[in-house]
Design a protein with these regions (language model features):
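Single conserved hydrophobic/aromatic residue that forms the stacking wall/gate
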Residues: 1-9
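Short helix-initiation/N-cap motifs at beta->coil->alpha
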Residues: 10-17, 104-112
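A late-sequence structural motif
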Residues: 139-183
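Ligand-binding cleft/hinge of the Venus flytrap
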Residues: 3, 68, 85-98
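A ligand-binding cleft/hinge motif common to bilobed small-molecule-binding domains
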Residues: 28-38, 86, 90, 94, ...
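Flexible hinge/capping segments at coil-to-helix
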Residues: 38-75, 164-166
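Hydrophobic residues within well-ordered alpha-helices
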Residues: 18-20, 70, 113-119, 154
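Short beta-strand-centered segments that line the small-molecule binding cleft or hinge
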Residues: 12-49, 53, 116, 139-141
Length: 184
């Protein structure tokens, strides 16, 4: 069962409360960029997000597609409470637009699999779609008026004592973090 946005914000705030109370050591987020003087950003990376379609989708014949035009297409999207979907919905609302997906799925890899074999389109971070993109199964759509980015951030409370083990863990996460997304 899908939970509402209120539940998502409540759970997110609970995570930050746990960090403030020293109940958790770190938080790893995938959302809009978080600025808070209580937290230290140990690592962060801006993740590009694109609309994408199968390689034979007729929309790829266009040089530029407006968000308004795109809204008339059939979409498969993640559930509305996912961070990047929430950011897309905010961008749509800012332009007085909305998308009515034909299907909402919680698993983004299932979305990629569906899109590569259909005329539908979707919107996901590049780190999720990069294998499909690099293998030539999907392509990014040239949408000219939607600039949404999500950030992965590793946060720690500013007063948290970092043991050698915690420092080693943070260093490992930074070392093994993903390389930049594929080119557009």
């Amino acid at each position: 069962m899908s939970r509402g946005l209120g539940d998502v914000y409540k759970r997110q705030e609970q995570m930050f409360d746990m960090l403030r109370k020293n109940e958790v050591d770190l938080i790893f987020t995938l959302d809009s960029h978080i600025y808070d003087s209580e937290f230290i950003i140990c690592a962060e990376h801006e993740e590009k997000v694109h609309f994408f379609a199968s390689v034979d989708n007729p929309l790829l014949n266009k040089e530029n597609i407006s968000l308004k035009e795109l809204c008339t297409e059939d979409f498969v999207l993640t559930e509305s409470n996912m961070s990047y979907r929430k950011l897309l919905n905010n961008e749509l609302a800012a332009q007085s637009l909305e998308i009515h997906p034909v299907l909402e799925i919680g698993n983004p890899l299932q979305i990629c699999s569906l899109i590569k074999n259909s005329k539908m389109i979707s919107f996901l971070p590049d780190f999720i779609t990069e294998d499909y993109y690099n293998s030539g199964e999907i392509k990014h759509l040239p949408v000219n008026d939607c600039d949404v980015s999500v950030w992965t951030q590793l946060l720690i409370h500013k007063n948290k004592w970092k043991s050698p083990a915690l420092n080693a863990f943070i260093d490992s996460l930074i070392h093994f973090s993903k390389s930049p997304s594929p080119p557009e």
